[in-house]
């Protein structure tokens, strides 16, 4: 099986994507294009429970009619194409209608359901949302209650609109009835506004720290969805299981909109998705019963599902699985493939600032070990190394990307900084390009910690630690983790003459960090903080220390009485890697222990 694209294949792929963008300058005409030919096909299937044998099924005809009706509702409410609509609600039929209608008729602003009250308030104030959609009062997580409290403190916010989670489509008590004239309202190229109109405002930069909002245009979004649809050859015969939230580009554009663009069905496995233990336990049976052909999970969810017996479920329709948000550890992929006998889990690499995927491995291409795939349609990838932009096979450096998916900027342009280099979007990730054009991600320049797909700004952790009496310096990095990919690890040094109590520091930091995922999993008190020649904390060294700690913990869990010397190092080829010096006879169990971590490693004899 080939790895890269021939020049003619790449040209054909790009031409198809360009044609879609030309025909569909916005989300409404794109969805209408997908279902217009066969509107009787399923568009959305919502399971109210994991064992729902009669899920709420919405045809393409009804789906488009509901979008047209919801767009008219926005107009009646005085919400226009330049107004923001915030959504703080889990996936369900009503949320989907509100989300895509808001994107077509206004500017959708989906909120991370894990946001704290303070983070939600900061976001909604930043975008000046006129309306906020939330689930009913009493919904787990207190989402409605968080939303309601904003009315008194957010001048722009006029009302909170309740979305039912039972499969009905209603905004508060007003049932939304499908508009039978959806074709004339949605199929027009101007139905969603001009291609450069901002249609979405997506939070990024984590659940902590100052609001950072990515502006995405119609063209960005359509290009992203078209590229994902073409990469995986999605057709109207497919049925995709949606396990990612709509506040994430993977759930919104790489999964949902790419399916709608092809006229394929999207299946929502309850409002809780993979946070619902019943969905995890019944995952393979859902795939069988709903005739799923495409699945997508973040690595943490892959690990959870890998431990669920298939129990004879018929998985013969399943074409492929994709994963993203962070690089999937080889051990998790191995365990998952032991349950589902596919050839590999297809890695997707992308950014919110790129409206979704930068690279992915098409299901009909070989995926070299460690690769995150090939650039998707209309995307160019390069590597910046030693001041030189390499557009072919390259040494290690910062990954760059460009294409019509590239965002025009942040809501607050002061946050833009040096995000572009000579017209290329800087990823902040370290990697290289292989001989066949495949891309490898080996590390990060940026300091964001990615815990199970959730971005955590280390500054919030560091600020909390620095407020503790006696702490002189503080730095947080990712601690490699077999389940979450990485978790926060905090390093501190004491001020001269001070003594730091680790337990007291841990309790203090936890009390000052609102988001549970951002609370440090481990704390190390150092005699001296590693710094660069100009005095800046040198985080690559801290990541090496964290990697060594994670490796020792993984080995000790199964081999508590075996001495294994661990050394972490960083280079441009492999990034952060481990070397384990192992006593005779213990290479196999040490290899198994280290295989659960998302890091390359070598075993050498003692």
Placement of each model-derived feature along the sequence:
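Conserved pre-ATP/AMP-binding loop-to-beta segment of ANL
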Residues: 22-24, 39-42, 162, 178-203, ...
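Conserved structural elements of the adenylate-forming
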Residues: 63-70, 214-235, 243, 253, ...
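Structural core segment of the AMP-binding/adenylate-forming
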Residues: 106-177, 601-605
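Conserved AMP-binding/adenylate-forming core of the ANL superfamily
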Residues: 23, 43-92, 96-99, 116-121, ...
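Conserved AMP-binding A3 loop
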Residues: 56-62, 199-223
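Conserved AMP-binding/adenylate-forming
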Residues: 269, 297, 321-324, 328, ...
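AMP-binding/adenylate-forming catalytic core of the ANL superfamily
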Residues: 115-122, 132-134, 295, 403, ...
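Conserved AMP-binding/adenylation subdomain of ANL enzymes
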Residues: 222-239, 249-293
């Amino acid at each position: 099986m080939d790895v890269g694209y021939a020049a003619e294949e790449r040209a054909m792929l790009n031409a198809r994507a360009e044609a879609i963008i030309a025909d569909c300058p916005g989300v409404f005409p794109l969805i209408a294009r997908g279902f217009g030919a066969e509107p009787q096909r399923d568009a959305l299937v919502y399971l109210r429970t994991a064992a729902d044998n009669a899920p709420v099924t919405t045809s393409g005809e009804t789906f488009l009619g509901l979008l047209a009706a919801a767009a008219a509702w926005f107009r009646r409410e005085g919400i226009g194409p330049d107004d923001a609509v915030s959504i703080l609600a889990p996936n369900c039929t009503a949320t989907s209608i509100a989300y895509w209608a808001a994107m077509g008729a206004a500017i959708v602003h989906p909120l991370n359901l894990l946001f704290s009250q303070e983070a939600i308030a900061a976001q909604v104030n930043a975008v000046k949302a006129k309306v906020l959609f939330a689930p009913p009062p009493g919904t787990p997580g207190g989402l409605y209650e968080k939303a309601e409290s904003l009315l008194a403190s957010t001048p722009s916010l006029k009302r909170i609109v309740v979305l039912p989670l039972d499969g009905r489509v209603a905004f508060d008590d007003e049932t939304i009835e499908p508009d039978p004239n959806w074709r004339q309202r949605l199929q027009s190229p101007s139905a969603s506004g001009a291609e450069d109109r901002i249609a979405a405002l997506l939070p990024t930069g984590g659940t902590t720290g100052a609001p950072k909002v990515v502006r995405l245009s119609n063209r960005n979004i359509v290009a992203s969805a078209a590229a994902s649809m073409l990469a995986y050859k999605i057709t109207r015969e497919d049925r995709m299981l949606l396990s990612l939230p709509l506040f994430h580009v993977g759930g919104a554009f790489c999964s949902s909109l790419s399916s709608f663009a092809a006229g394929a069905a999207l299946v929502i496995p309850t409002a809780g998705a993979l946070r619902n233990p019943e969905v995890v336990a019944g995952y393979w049976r859902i795939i069988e019963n709903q005739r799923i052909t495409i699945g997508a999970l973040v690595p943490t969810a892959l690990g959870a599902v890998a431990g669920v017996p298939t129990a004879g479920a018929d998985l013969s329709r399943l074409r492929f699985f994709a994963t993203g948000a962070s690089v999937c550890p080889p051990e998790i992929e191995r365990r998952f493939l032991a349950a589902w006998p596919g050839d590999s889990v297809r890695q997707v690499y992308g950014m919110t600032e790129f409206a979704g995927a930068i690279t992915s491995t098409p299901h009909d291409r070989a995926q070299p070990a460690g690769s995150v795939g090939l650039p998707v349609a209309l995307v160019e990838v390069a590597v910046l190394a030693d001041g030189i932009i390499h557009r072919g096979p390259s040494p290690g450096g910062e990954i760059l990307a460009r294409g019509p998916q590239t965002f025009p900027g942040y809501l607050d342009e002061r946050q833009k900084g040096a995000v572009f280099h000579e017209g290329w979007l800087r990823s902040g990730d370290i990697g290289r390009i292989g001989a066949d054009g495949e891309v490898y991600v080996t590390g990060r320049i940026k300091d964001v910690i990615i815990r199970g797909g959730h971005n955590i700004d280390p500054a919030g952790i560091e600020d909390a630690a620095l407020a503790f009496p006696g702490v002189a310096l503080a730095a947080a990095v990712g601690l490699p983790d077999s389940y979450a990919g990485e978790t926060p690890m905090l390093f501190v040094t004491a001020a001269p003459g001070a003594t730091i109590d680790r337990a007291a520091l841990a309790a203090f930091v936890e009390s000052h960090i609102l988001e549970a995922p951002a609370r440090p999993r481990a704390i190390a008190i150092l005699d001296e903080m590693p710094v660069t020649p100009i005095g800046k904390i040198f985080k690559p060294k801290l990541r090496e220390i964290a990697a060594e700690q994670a490796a020792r913990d993984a080995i000790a869990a199964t081999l508590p009485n075996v001495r294994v010397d661990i050394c972490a190092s960083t280079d441009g080829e492999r990034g952060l890697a481990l070397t384990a010096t192992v006593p005779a006879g213990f290479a196999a169990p040490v290899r198994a222990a280290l295989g659960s971590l998302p890091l390359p490693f070598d075993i050498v004899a003692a």
